[in-house]
């Protein structure tokens, strides 16, 4: 399980340190792809396989299903952690998420998310203001 929030810098080669707390659960090789809310999602291989199987079940005849799977899989890349605990995030993914210098690496249950620092701070501010309403809307899920 992933939880917590860490601020790291992206170097000039597009590399970022993966927090040591996350490296053990992610493994030496994992998948990074475009996520929702203009961030990147990272999944351990076992979680990626589960998600991949679920997405394969989406009906090919549905336009939204095709669009989502194209978006999700076309942006996916397998990353390996180097000896310094870094991964290289390709330019297309950095551009999608607006990752330039400072990056928030956050744990979200079964995945890790990479956020541009400004975008993350804006998201947190907006979410804090509506957290009670969000929680109320999730009551139907018995949380």
From Swiss-Prot:
Keywords: Cytoplasm, DNA-binding, Repeat, Transcription, Transcription regulation. Pfam families: MraZ. InterPro entries: MraZ, MraZ_C, MraZ_dom, MraZ_N, MraZ_sf, SpoVT-AbrB_dom, SpoVT-AbrB_sf. GO terms for molecular function: DNA-binding transcription factor activity; transcription cis-regulatory region binding. Gene3D superfamilies: Transcriptional regulator MraZ domain. Residues 5-47, 76-119 form the SpoVT-AbrB domain. GO terms for biological process: negative regulation of DNA-templated transcription initiation. Its main location: cytoplasm. It is found in: Cytoplasm, Nucleoid. One of its GO terms (cellular component) is cytoplasm. Belongs to the MraZ family. Forms oligomers. This is Transcriptional regulator MraZ. It comes from Oceanobacillus iheyensis (strain DSM 14371 / CIP 107618 / JCM 11309 / KCTC 3954 / HTE831).
């Amino acid at each position: 399980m992933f939880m917590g929030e860490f601020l790291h810098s992206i170097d000039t080669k597009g590399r970022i340190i993966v927090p040591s707390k996350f490296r053990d659960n992610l493994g030496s090789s994992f998948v990074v792809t475009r996520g929702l809310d203009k961030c990147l999602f990272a999944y351990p291989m076992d979680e990626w396989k589960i998600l991949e199987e679920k997405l394969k079940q989406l009906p090919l005849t549905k336009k939204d299903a095709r669009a989502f799977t194209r978006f999700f899989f076309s942006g996916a890349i397998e990353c390996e952690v180097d000896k310094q605990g870094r991964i290289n995030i390709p330019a297309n993914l950095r551009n999608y998420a607006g990752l330039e210098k400072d990056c928030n690496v956050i744990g979200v249950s079964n995945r890790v998310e990479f956020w541009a620092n400004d975008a993350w701070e804006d998201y947190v501010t907006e979410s804090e203001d509506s957290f009670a309403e969000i929680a109320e809307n999730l009551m139907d899920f018995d949380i």
